[in-house]
Amino acid sequence: MASFKIVIVCLALLVAVASARRRDMMSDDELDYHFSKRGIPCACDSDGPDIRSASLSGIVWMGSCPSGWKKCKSYYSIVADCCNQ
C-alpha cells in the first residue's frame, strides 16, 4: 500500500512539472518600467527643502543613474544617486 502511495505522489509531481508553463520574457521597455517602480523614492532638489511635504519624485539607484535618467540631487554619493527621468 505504501508503494502505491509513492507511485501516486510521483505521478502527481510528474504531471505538475510537465504542465508548468514558462513565463514570457519581458521587453527592455517593460523591464525599465518595472525596475523604476521598484526603487526607493527620494526627494530631488526640485521637490523643495521640506522632506515631509516633498513629492519624492526621484528614485534611488545604486552606483550611478542609468541611461535616460539624470541625477537630481546636488550632493555627491559614492554608493547611490537620487535620479529621475
UniProtKB/Swiss-Prot annotation:
Disulfide bond annotation, renumbered to this chain: 42-82, 44-72, 65-83
Xref: Gene3D superfamilies: Anthopleurin-A (2.20.20.10)
Subcellular location: Secreted
Residues spanning the signal sequence: 1-20
Described function: Binds to site 3 of voltage-gated sodium channels and inhibits the inactivation process. Is highly active on DmNav1/TipE (drosophila) and is only extremely weakly active on rat Nav1.4-beta-1/SCN4A-SCN1B, and on human Nav1.5-beta-1/SCN5A-beta-1. This reveals high specificity for arthropod over mammalian channels. In vivo, when released into the medium, this recombinant toxin induces impaired swimming, paralysis and death of the crustacean A.nauplii within several hours. Also causes paralysis of cherry shrimps immediately after injection at very low doses.
Propeptide: 21-36
Family stated for the protein in its record: Belongs to the sea anemone sodium channel inhibitory toxin family. Type II subfamily.
SUPFAM superfamilies in the record: Defensin-like
This protein's UniProt keywords: Cleavage on pair of basic residues, Disulfide bond, Ion channel impairing toxin, Neurotoxin, Secreted, Signal, Toxin, Voltage-gated sodium channel impairing toxin
GO cellular component labels: extracellular region
Additional observations: Nv1 toxin seems to be encoded by 8 different genes. 4 of them code for identical precursors, whereas 4 others code for very similar precursors. In the genome draft, 6 additional loci are also correlated to Nv1 toxin, but they are not predicted to be functional genes. This high similarity may be explained by concerted evolution.
Record-given protein name: N.vectensis toxin 1 2
Keyword Transmembrane helix: no
Claim: Phosphoprotein is one of the keywords in the record: no
Family annotation (InterPro entries): Myo_ane_neurotoxin_sf
Entry's Gene Ontology molecular function annotations: sodium channel regulator activity; toxin activity
One Pfam family cited in the UniProt record for this chain: Toxin_4
Outcome of mutating residue 35 to L: In Nv1-7 and Nv1-12
Tissue: Expressed in ectodermal glands and in clumps outside of the extodermal layer. Is not expressed in nematocytes. In adult female tissues, shows similar expression levels in mesenteries (gametes-producing tissue), tentacles, pharynx and physa.
Origin species: Nematostella vectensis
